[in-house]
Design a protein with these regions (language model features):
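C-terminal segment of N-terminal export signals and the immediately downstream linker at the start
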Residues: 1, 23-46
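Pocket-lining segment of extracytoplasmic ligand-binding domains
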Residues: 104, 187-275
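Secondary-structure end/capping motifs
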Residues: 243-320
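Solvent-exposed, polar/charged alpha-helical surfaces in well-ordered, non-transmembrane soluble domains
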Residues: 67, 89, 93, 107, ...
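N-terminal export signals
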Residues: 6-28
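Short helix-loop capping/hinge motifs at secondary-structure junctions, enriched
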Residues: 138-146, 175, 238-247
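Conserved C-terminal helix/tail region of periplasmic/extracytoplasmic solute-binding proteins
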Residues: 311-345
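Short, glycine-/small- and polar/acidic-enriched structural segments
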Residues: 37-172, 182-183, 199-202, 227
Length: 345
């Protein structure tokens, strides 16, 4: 419970003064080891507890992990969370072992003292970011993003939207202090936005596509070109150190699933319609903006990109302390042993 409160406090203290001074001495330096003493094939658990977000998870829907792990006598359990920050809270509370989030939630979790490690990243393309938007109702008097100063903007603090808004504001010479942040999970904000009770909303698919089909959204800008390093699979540190063989299987299956999905987009759409109860037209809109570019290993280049994100949160006063991404990594030789060579770029 202590870790969960810390995480919530960090996410709540987004602008201005901080009430988190008590945290600064309590976050342990978890330190990346220079060389591995771990067996890269080790698997100690009989149950893998996976976290996923309510927006949907193809990894869960296709059950590729279950098929791979059943011969090894390992079960897979899935727990749903509203968004990335809530998933990170669940991991800190010991409810899950591994989960998928954007670039921002693990940074807030790190500040709060969570003992986590980065497992694998996500490849980006030139069009990645089309599904994440800053939007207004059609009748809004705001005509362009450059008019955003002073506006109330609704999004989930500590989510990927937090980095999106920082970079978007930076691109037009503004800072986080030039807007009024209102934190609300996307699923809750959608209803209020569709009813015209939210002036500016940051969202993504499928919520964006649902509002788009209803004719109730006008996009001010998307996140294309704002240099996010992309999302990650994150694991509890103790679990990762004791089960690197399981992480190896997870990475292999994820990478293979991305290749399958890009080659079978119609089947992915059918799964989406079935699992998320989406209208076919909404699913078409989601798929038109979605890419399956594959996974990206924890290379020095990716680590540097994630460090840049963490530094921006500190430099803009969103988090109260500077963090080092390298403190939340496994040893380099262990990554090399569990990650396909082709994705270590």
């Amino acid at each position: 419970m202590i870790k969960r409160r810390r995480f919530l406090n960090v996410a709540a203290s987004s602008v201005g003064g901080f009430s988190l001074a008590h945290l600064l001495g309590s976050c342990s330096n978890q330190g990346q080891q220079s060389s591995s003493t771990f067996d890269p094939n080790a698997i100690k658990v009989k149950v893998l507890r996976m976290g996923y977000q309510s927006a949907g998870d193809l990894f869960r829907n296709r059950q590729v992990l279950e098929k791979r792990l059943e011969p090894l006598g390992i079960k897979v359990e899935w727990a749903q969370f509203v968004q990335g920050p809530q998933l990170m809270e669940g991991m800190a509370a010991g409810k899950i072992d591994v989960g998928s989030v954007g670039e921002t939630p693990p940074i807030f979790a790190q500040v709060a003292g969570s003992k986590l490690v980065y497992v694998v990243g996500t490849q980006r393309t030139a069009t990645t970011g089309r599904s994440s938007v800053i939007a207004v109702p059609p009748e809004s008097t705001l005509r362009k993003f450059e008019e955003i100063k002073g506006q109330e903007i609704y999004f989930q603090k500590g989510s990927a939207s937090h980095y999106f808004i920082l970079r978007a504001l930076q691109s037009i010479g503004l800072t986080i202090k030039d807007i009024k942040i209102r934190s609300m999970p996307t699923i809750e904000a959608r209803g209020a936005f569709l009813e015209g009770r939210i002036p500016v909303w940051m969202t993504g698919d499928p919520h964006y596509a649902i509002a788009e089909k209803m004719g109730r959204i006008r996009v001010l800008r998307d996140s294309v070109g704002l240099d996010s390093p992309g999302g990650y699979y994150i694991a509890d540190r103790k679990f990762a150190e004791e089960n690197p063989g399981l992480l190896k299987i997870l990475i292999e299956e994820l990478h293979g699933l991305d290749k399958w999905a890009e080659a079978h987009r119609d089947e992915v759409k059918k799964l989406m319609i079935s699992e998320q109860k989406l209208d076919p037209d909404v699913a078409d809109r989601v798929m038109s903006r979605r890419t399956f570019a594959g996974r990206r290993g924890l290379s020095p280049a990716l680590i540097a990109e994630q460090q840049r994100v963490a530094d921006l949160f500190f430099e803009t006063g969103v988090i109260p302390k500077k963090i080092d991404i390298k403190d939340f990594l496994l040893p380099p030789d262990l990554y090399a042993a569990i990650t396909p060579t082709e994705i270590m770029v």
